[in-house]
Amino acid sequence: MTFNICVLISGNGTNLQAIIDAIESKYLNVCIKVVISNKETAYGLERAKKASIETRVFSLQKYLKQDPINNTRSTYGLELAKIIREYSSIDLIVLAGWMIILPATFLKEFTDNKPTIDIINLHPALPGQYPGAHAIERAFNDFKENKIKHSGIMIHKVIEEVDAGEVILTKEIPILPTDTLESLEERFHQQEHKSLVESIKLLSTK
């Protein structure tokens, strides 16, 4: 039985490409049913199209413009969940560079209603360290102040608290004296691709 996933992206789609490559090489026995982006210009959509994967664009900005006063993010979350529910056989939702914090309305659709669907995210920090944005830069600054010698990445299940859900996989990444922020970010990205693919493999074969 094929394990079906939905991938949410916001940008270049390098993590998406890593998943596509792992499927094409037969390392992953999964099917990407749909790639959804909140940005029409996201290059990851082109990567999906080249691999003959269905794509959808669902922008938050439209909701903010229509009703900037009320809680439009909650409405956006509900509507996004409805789109994913159109694909009745989804087994896993993967956030691969998705830059919008998902509201509780979205998360509860997949935790409170059947069938439940796990949602996983990649965060460039170890559990309990550097939640939120700019995690690599914050780790690099702490390294320069001799506060840490390494950082890392984790793949975790998504809950309402940012970057705090059940951990699926972690990978420690040393910070070298010769590192620049750019070289450290590159090493992080290389490991992110591997770890995201490995996490999908773990969940699809359990």
UniProtKB/Swiss-Prot annotation:
Site entry: Raises pKa of active site His: 163
Pfam families attached to this UniProt entry: Formyl_trans_N
EC number(s) stated in the UniProt entry for this protein: 2.1.2.2
Residues annotated for (6R)-10-formyltetrahydrofolate binding in this entry: 99-102, 121, 163
SUPFAM superfamilies for this protein: Formyltransferase
Residues that hold N(1)-(5-phospho-beta-D-ribosyl)glycinamide according to the record: 13-15, 192
Lineage: superkingdom: Eukaryota
Molecular function, one GO term: phosphoribosylglycinamide formyltransferase activity
GO BP terms in the entry: 'de novo' IMP biosynthetic process; adenine biosynthetic process; purine nucleotide biosynthetic process
Chain segments annotated as coiled-coil in the UniProt record: none
Keywords, in A-Z order: Purine biosynthesis, Transferase
Pathway membership, UniProt: Purine metabolism; IMP biosynthesis via de novo pathway; N(2)-formyl-N(1)-(5-phospho-D-ribosyl)glycinamide from N(1)-(5-phospho-D-ribosyl)glycinamide (10-formyl THF route): step 1/1
Residues the record marks as active site: 123 (proton donor)
UniProt GO cellular component terms: cytoplasm
Catalytic reaction annotation: N(1)-(5-phospho-beta-D-ribosyl)glycinamide + (6R)-10-formyltetrahydrofolate = N(2)-formyl-N(1)-(5-phospho-beta-D-ribosyl)glycinamide + (6S)-5,6,7,8-tetrahydrofolate + H(+)
CDD domains: FMT_core_GART
Family stated for the protein in its record: Belongs to the GART family.
Protein name listed in UniProt: Phosphoribosylglycinamide formyltransferase
